[in-house]
């Protein structure tokens, strides 16, 4: 079964990936590289790094695509690749946004009170 390649994902606009393990290893490695530019105490880095390392170890350990899909629990492997691409994009944006830095100005005292 590992040698067979599916013809379609059944999802419009999402093509079949012929080398999903290689693609995921590249994406997860890039995500980890980008996270290295974020302070170690930032929550986003801490948790994203943990999840990405777990997923990368699954990709390295499981050669069968079907079993990998089940372990990752992210849908078809092409959907997992799309999620990784989106995470890489977000990680790059987080570096620009710097959410770990203090606010420019203090929020109003009643900002979090509801109802007003």
Swiss-Prot record:
The gene is NDUFA5. Keywords: Acetylation, Electron transport, Membrane, Mitochondrion, Mitochondrion inner membrane, Phosphoprotein, Respiratory chain, Transport. This is NADH dehydrogenase [ubiquinone] 1 alpha subcomplex subunit 5. It is a peripheral membrane protein. InterPro entries: NDUFA5. Accessory subunit of the mitochondrial membrane respiratory chain NADH dehydrogenase (Complex I), that is believed not to be involved in catalysis. Complex I functions in the transfer of electrons from NADH to the respiratory chain. The immediate electron acceptor for the enzyme is believed to be ubiquinone. The modification N-acetylalanine is found at residue 2. Belongs to the complex I NDUFA5 subunit family. It is found in: Mitochondrion inner membrane. The modification N6-acetyllysine is found at residues 30, 46, 60, 98. The modification Phosphoserine is found at residue 89. Complex I is composed of 45 different subunits. It comes from Bos taurus. Its main location: mitochondrion. GO terms for biological process: respiratory electron transport chain. One of its GO terms (cellular component) is mitochondrion. The modification N6-succinyllysine is found at residue 98.
């Amino acid at each position: 079964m590992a040698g067979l390649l599916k013809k379609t994902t059944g999802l419009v606009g999402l093509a079949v990936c012929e080398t999903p393990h290689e693609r995921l290893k590249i994406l997860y490695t890039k995500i980890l590289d980008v996270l290295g530019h974020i302070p170690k105490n930032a929550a986003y880095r801490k948790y994203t790094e943990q999840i990405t390392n777990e997923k990368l170890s699954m990709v390295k350990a499981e050669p069968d695509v079907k079993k990998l899909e089940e372990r990752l629990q992210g849908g078809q492997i092409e959907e997992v690749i799309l999620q990784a691409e989106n995470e890489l994009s977000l990680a790059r944006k987080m570096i620009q946004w710097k959410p770990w830095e203090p606010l420019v100005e203090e929020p109003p005292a009643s900002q979090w009170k509801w109802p007003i």
